């Protein structure tokens, strides 16, 4: 598809659906806030990856060349605290869970980003940005830290709608702040923590500064789309805009935010203890089925997890899969065709995946009727269209990704990467006689459906009866 029909996307900054017009004709630049690699990925994390992978695939189908950047936050308070509690180097902890996230994305066939920068690899760019903000009077030093002066930027709140009097950064009280509404750009060095030299002393970057510097480095001072979870609208994305604009640059022209995965009406999060880890989910369903489920709701809506909803999604996916296999057996090879006009209309309407999937299942129903009546040409036509549509959604059952790999083996391989990272943490805790941490890790794995057995050859785990 190269005629590029009109695409409309909901822009959080505008609070409305807008026509999408890229900065450069034929090219789209996207920045997605990636993971803070502090622990195992759960389906709430991966939903964001799947949602914006569909956006990327649709833009490619429309004929755009897409630059897609997804960062890795590998230096953060949570990473430092968890690594210290486990007696591990912070960088090793971050690298371990970065691999776990990569395995989870790969298991669900989320396309690799054009670049995946780590925060620690871009300290120079962050320091340069902060220097510009200080020079322009938008930032100041205090007790070894550097803060952004919120009152110096009158447009603060334009993304989130927050009134300046209602701003709470969630950073706690800091003695170096002139105003508690200000936010941290740079944290002064503390004993035992990593630090880098700067003109105002050693320290490490604040979270909000990291993404601005990396977005500028890979996409320039102005780019098309910034994506992330709706929980990032404030303060993270609001603070990104303030820094970039105050420094004299543009920033993202469209802001897209996905809804949460919820359980019992509450956001899925580690702090609430209601997460469903990827290993547990891959025990219950195949990777393609999990991807179908996570991508089936509108990206801006909440996805309330339930076993019934998951099994309904599996049943729907299997119905499509079985139809395509029937056509291939009775008619012959099924090459991808073109999406239906109604499917294209749905995705052009702010990525309305539920309406797009309704078109997939309508085509399946018509194809089954054609096949049953002996209309092989009609059945093949519907099957080819379905392959195109499901391919854009990233879960075409006949794609070589799912066809040439035994899915249970692929899932098990992904689980193995994730579980062994946790077992490595547990062994180090045992070596240090940190029995409480070792038990905590074992219990966490048990909650994910994984049983650990200590043997003379080291810990072994079982998943659904299969030993590793």
Curated annotation (Swiss-Prot):
Location in the cell reads: Cytoplasm
Name the gene for this chain. cysS
Could you identify this protein by its name? Cysteine--tRNA ligase
- Drop me one GO molecular function for this one: zinc ion binding
The scientific name of the source species is Mycobacterium avium (strain 104)
Provide the family line: Belongs to the class-I aminoacyl-tRNA synthetase family.
Its needed co-factors are: Zn(2+)
EC number of the protein: 6.1.1.16
Q: How is the cofactor bound?
A: Binds 1 zinc ion per subunit.
Q: Which reaction does it catalyse?
A: tRNA(Cys) + L-cysteine + ATP = L-cysteinyl-tRNA(Cys) + AMP + diphosphate
